[in-house]
């Protein structure tokens, strides 16, 4: 029996196992050594049990898979060939690990006899992603000495560990030949005989029973709910954010929200008004802070958390540490709505009114300072004007803009907002946005900085695969404007931090055959958006602005609000 046939049998069992674990998207890069895996993924697609996506750039492919997994909330498989193709997945693996996004990385490998002997495209791939995967499976070369049941069991157990997210790396060595295997030879191979009934049924090999862990009410909750408290809400899935705002309002507690929280802010612009030392000192009089979620963007929110020394509780639905300030705290590993049910509120009047007064003052002052020109700050402040009312998702890239959006906007509750704030890199943002469009099957709006766009230009090719409207805002402030916030000499900052490029993006759009517009006013933008939303294709909207506009407005708002005198 040809080795090419058994390579395919081995790959069939791997992908059949992953399919039963919820994998329906297979992201495939070109390569010969991964042929057995690629052809079996194609077979699943032909049978209506999966969708294959392709991209020529493995780094972008990894982030594309990350985006699909974020939006679909299901594991996504990535298939790549051996060599440095595998290493290009590392940034996406890091981001997935930091944010608990389920990815399954399938790296084809040379067989052991071709390693460390000068063979082409053969590198050391076993455990190459170090501690970032939750499981690293180094499979042997395909051999009938290992039963199909063993292979399924190994993969099934790893997938069970992935139920709360994270990355699984499966390294699969294949010896040649890799081609010319007949489907009938594969399906009728004796090695598969003991699992034929399993292959005809859509069920997991190992049936894990759900563990229902009831949230226990804190034994001193009746006392703590009478105290002065603050609710801090960080990054949460939209389905976990329900009920938090109402609960906080009933308690009369201050609630501070991150733009990633999917909770409508009752005290918007927190990253601005927390610069006010008078109000911050009064907030520090709180007796308890309860944190839902994590990954706070705002610098002032993080400074407040670092300063707070009182009782601290964290509600987070995984085992990860999410307290960079190392409070002595009480940890509840629970979904927020389960925790809220176990900790009923006590209706009280607000214990502190100054934040509300300051937030209202901020609203008027921000509107005045931002003005009516089309710039970073006005886009962030009026971000809801850019978005369709329904059936759409928003992706915010890692640049100055995400900080402005967090500080200046009031997003609607439960509007789907995605970010890559695990490692907060600027790599792979376009690819992630394209994946989110695929995973959500909804209209996409993405706000991405110019340097981030230049870093991931290859990924514009992915947008040709979309079948829905997608709007990519490229915020072109001629380099890394986020570094304008640093206390560095201007000349040094320009050359070594900002790195101005003096480029524009119309020719990039033409290269990838995407629509392009460059509006100069809000009226121009309204016309462009109306056209873009009517087309089932991608439009690049370049907002070219003065380099320092956004950072200057941001710094000025923080300075002015920081010294404002607010009476109640």
From Swiss-Prot:
A GO molecular-function annotation: manganese ion binding
Any single Pfam family the record assigns to this protein: TPP_enzyme_C
One Gene Ontology biological process: menaquinone biosynthetic process
Reaction catalyzed: isochorismate + 2-oxoglutarate + H(+) = 5-enolpyruvoyl-6-hydroxy-2-succinyl-cyclohex-3-ene-1-carboxylate + CO2
Entry note: cofactor: Binds 1 thiamine pyrophosphate per subunit.
Top-rank taxon, per record: Bacteria
Family per similarity comment: Belongs to the TPP enzyme family. MenD subfamily.
HAMAP family recorded: MenD
Role summary: Catalyzes the thiamine diphosphate-dependent decarboxylation of 2-oxoglutarate and the subsequent addition of the resulting succinic semialdehyde-thiamine pyrophosphate anion to isochorismate to yield 2-succinyl-5-enolpyruvyl-6-hydroxy-3-cyclohexene-1-carboxylate (SEPHCHC).
Protein name (record): 2-succinyl-5-enolpyruvyl-6-hydroxy-3-cyclohexene-1-carboxylate synthase
Underlying gene: menD
């Amino acid at each position: 029996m040809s080795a090419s046939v058994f390579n395919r049998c081995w790959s069939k069992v791997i992908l059949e196992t992953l399919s039963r674990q919820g994998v329906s998207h297979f992201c495939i890069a070109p390569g010969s050594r991964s042929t057995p895996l690629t052809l079996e993924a194609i077979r699943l697609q032909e049978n209506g049990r999966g969708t294959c996506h392709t991209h020529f750039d493995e780094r972008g492919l990894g982030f594309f898979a990350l985006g699909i997994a974020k939006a679909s909330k299901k594991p996504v498989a990535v298939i790549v060939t051996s060599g440095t193709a595998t290493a290009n997945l590392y940034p996406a693996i890091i981001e997935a690990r930091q944010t608990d996004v389920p990815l399954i990385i399938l790296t084809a490998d040379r067989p052991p006899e071709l390693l460390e002997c000068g063979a082409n495209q053969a590198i050391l791939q076993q455990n190459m992603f170090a501690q970032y995967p939750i499981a690293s499976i180094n499979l042997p070369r395909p051999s009938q000495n290992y039963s199909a049941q063993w292979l399924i069991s190994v993969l099934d157990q790893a997938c069970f560990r992935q139920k709360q997210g994270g990355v699984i790396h499966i390294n699969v060595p294949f010896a040649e030949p890799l081609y010319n295997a007949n489907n009938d030879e594969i399906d009728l191979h004796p090695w598969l005989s003991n699992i034929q009934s399993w292959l005809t049924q859509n069920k997991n090999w190992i049936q894990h029973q759900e563990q229902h862990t009831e949230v226990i009410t804190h034994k001193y909750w009746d006392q703590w709910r009478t105290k002065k408290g603050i609710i801090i809400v960080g990054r949460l899935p939209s389905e976990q954010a329900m009920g938090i705002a109402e609960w906080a309002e009933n308690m009369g507690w201050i609630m501070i929200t991150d733009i990633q929280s999917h909770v409508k802010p009752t005290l918007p612009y927190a990253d601005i008004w927390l610069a006010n030392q008078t109000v911050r000192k009064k907030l520090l009089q709180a007796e308890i802070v309860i944190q839902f979620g994590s990954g706070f963007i705002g610098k002032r929110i993080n400074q407040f958390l670092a300063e707070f020394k009182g009782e601290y509780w964290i509600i987070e639905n995984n085992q990860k540490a999410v307290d960079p300030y190392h409070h002595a705290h009480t940890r509840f590993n629970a979904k927020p709505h389960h925790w809220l049910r176990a900790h009923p509120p006590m209706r009280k009047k607000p214990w502190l009114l100054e934040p509300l007064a300051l937030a209202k003052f901020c609203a008027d002052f921000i509107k005045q300072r931002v003005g009516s020109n089309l710039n970073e700050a006005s886009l962030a402040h009026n971000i809801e004007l850019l978005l369709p009312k329904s059936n759409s998702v928003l992706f915010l890239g890692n640049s100055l803009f995400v900080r402005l959006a967090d500080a200046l906007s009031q997003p609607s509750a439960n509007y789907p907002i995605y970010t890559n704030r695990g490692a907060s890199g600027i790599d792979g943002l376009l690819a992630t946005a394209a994946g989110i469009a695929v995973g959500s099957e909804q209209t996409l709006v993405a706000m991405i900085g110019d340097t981030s766009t230049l870093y991931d230009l290859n990924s514009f090719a992915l947008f040709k695969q979309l079948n829905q409207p997608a709007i990519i805002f490229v915020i072109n402030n001629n380099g890394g404007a986020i570094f304008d916030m640093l206390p560095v000499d201007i000349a040094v900052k320009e050359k070594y931090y900002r790195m101005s490029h003096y480029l524009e993006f119309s020719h990039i759009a033409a290269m990838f055959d995407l629509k392009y517009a460059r509006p100069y006013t809000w009226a121009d933008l309204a016309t462009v958006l109306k056209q873009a939303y009517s087309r089932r294709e991608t439009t690049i909207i370049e907002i070219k602005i003065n380099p320092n506009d956004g950072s200057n407005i941001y710094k000025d708002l923080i300075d002015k609000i920081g010294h404002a005198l607010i009476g109640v």
